[in-house]
From Swiss-Prot:
<feature type="binding site">
    <location>
        <position position="221"/>
    </location>
    <ligand>
        <name>S-adenosyl-L-methionine</name>
    </ligand>
</feature>
<dbReference type="InterPro" id="IPR004551">
    <property type="entry name" value="Dphthn_synthase"/>
</dbReference>
<dbReference type="GO" id="GO:0032259">
    <property type="term" value="P:methylation"/>
</dbReference>
<dbReference type="InterPro" id="IPR000878">
    <property type="entry name" value="4pyrrol_Mease"/>
</dbReference>
<dbReference type="GO" id="GO:0141133">
    <property type="term" value="F:diphthine methyl ester synthase activity"/>
</dbReference>
<dbReference type="GO" id="GO:0005829">
    <property type="term" value="C:cytosol"/>
</dbReference>
<dbReference type="InterPro" id="IPR014777">
    <property type="entry name" value="4pyrrole_Mease_sub1"/>
</dbReference>
<protein>
    <recommendedName>
        <fullName>Diphthine methyl ester synthase</fullName>
        <ecNumber>2.1.1.314</ecNumber>
    </recommendedName>
</protein>
<dbReference type="InterPro" id="IPR014776">
    <property type="entry name" value="4pyrrole_Mease_sub2"/>
</dbReference>
<feature type="binding site">
    <location>
        <begin position="112"/>
        <end position="113"/>
    </location>
    <ligand>
        <name>S-adenosyl-L-methionine</name>
    </ligand>
</feature>
<dbReference type="InterPro" id="IPR035996">
    <property type="entry name" value="4pyrrol_Methylase_sf"/>
</dbReference>
<keyword id="KW-0808">Transferase</keyword>
<feature type="binding site">
    <location>
        <position position="246"/>
    </location>
    <ligand>
        <name>S-adenosyl-L-methionine</name>
    </ligand>
</feature>
<dbReference type="GO" id="GO:2000765">
    <property type="term" value="P:regulation of cytoplasmic translation"/>
</dbReference>
<dbReference type="GO" id="GO:0005634">
    <property type="term" value="C:nucleus"/>
</dbReference>
<feature type="binding site">
    <location>
        <position position="163"/>
    </location>
    <ligand>
        <name>S-adenosyl-L-methionine</name>
    </ligand>
</feature>
<keyword id="KW-0949">S-adenosyl-L-methionine</keyword>
Length: 283
């Protein structure tokens, strides 16, 4: 059997009881280590499980799926995933490949940012499509995220923005020269995300990601020191919410007054928050 097991949001203790029982019976255990990160070292997992955990980077997951699935028709193999197992298309690819090899698959779910974001007080059923925001480079500044946010804005819906993670990435030069030299890990901050959104707004001028757009930023969700920030996009661009991981929400115009009341507790500037929130309620 091939198992995809969600680890939850923070540390080794967030795995479900069912997930832990399953891991302990597996002969081989991989930790998917590039679509998200756990906020503890893998040694903590190994200590809890009493088993070796193999780090599976992008290259292994995308290019060596048959190696991961090897013998899973005769023994139990697990892929551990931060958050929920189906939070990335890569994991769907693994399931499809396992099916092609006639290997049975089972998923064990867990909390992810997709549902934990409700901790900020915004109602989950009022969210539109989730978007991803990548690091802007000199010659690479994609704006497709802006168009997706625009669609959500037109419907009055909130937008969850997932921020870029660079783990075991190569520079363009090293990639072109075929050198397996990797850059240090980078995790996009909420403030940088806000800055990039404002840059695109300045270019597009469509009033989608304006300095006065209400937003929420969350950091280290599920941890003991998680932080929730509420304010304008301009305020977020100037505010540091600490170590990773971060996510951002742009508040939709169809926001309910109870949602705004909940958010007030996290406002970085209450007077300014109330001023901007009033314009949302006057829609």
């Amino acid at each position: 059997m091939f198992y995809l097991i969600g680890l939850g949001l923070f540390d080794e203790k967030d795995i479900t009881l069912r997930g832990l029982e399953t891991v302990k019976k597996c002969q081989r255990i991989y930790l998917e280590a590039y679509t998200s990160i756990l906020l503890v070292q893998k040694e903590k997992l190994e200590e809890l499980y009493g088993k070796e955990v193999i780090l599976a980077d992008r290259e292994m997951v995308e290019s060596s799926s048959d190696e991961i699935l090897k013998d899973a028709d005769n023994c139990d193999v697990a892929m551990l995933v931060v958050g929920d197992p189906m939070g990335a298309t890569t994991h769907a690819d693994l399931v499809i490949r396992a099916r092609e090899l006639k290997i049975p698959v089972r998923m064990i779910h867990n909390a992810s940012i997709m549902n934990a974001i409700g901790a900020c007080g915004l109602q989950l059923y009022k969210f539109g499509q989730t978007v991803s925001l990548v690091f802007f480079e000199n010659n690479y500044r994609p704006q497709s995220f802006y168009d997706h946010i625009k669609e959500n804005v037109s419907l009055g819906l909130h937008t969850l923005v997932l921020l870029d993670i660079k783990v075991k990435e190569q520079s363009w030069e090293n990639l072109a020269r075929g050198r397996k030299v990797y850059e240090p890990p980078r995790y996009m901050s909420a403030s940088l995300a806000a800055q990039q959104m404002l840059e695109v707004e300045e270019d597009r001028q469509e009033n989608i990601c304006t300095p006065d757009s209400l937003c929420v930023a969350v950091g280290r969700m599920g941890s003991d020191d998680q932080v929730i920030f509420a304010g304008t996009l301009q305020e977020l661009a100037e505010h540091d919410i600490g170590p990773p991981l971060h996510s951002v929400v742009l508040v939709g115009r169809d926001v309910h007054d109870l949602e705004l009341e909940f958010l007030r507790a996290y406002a970085v500037n209450l007077e300014n928050f109330d001023r901007v929130a009033k314009t949302y309620l006057e829609k």
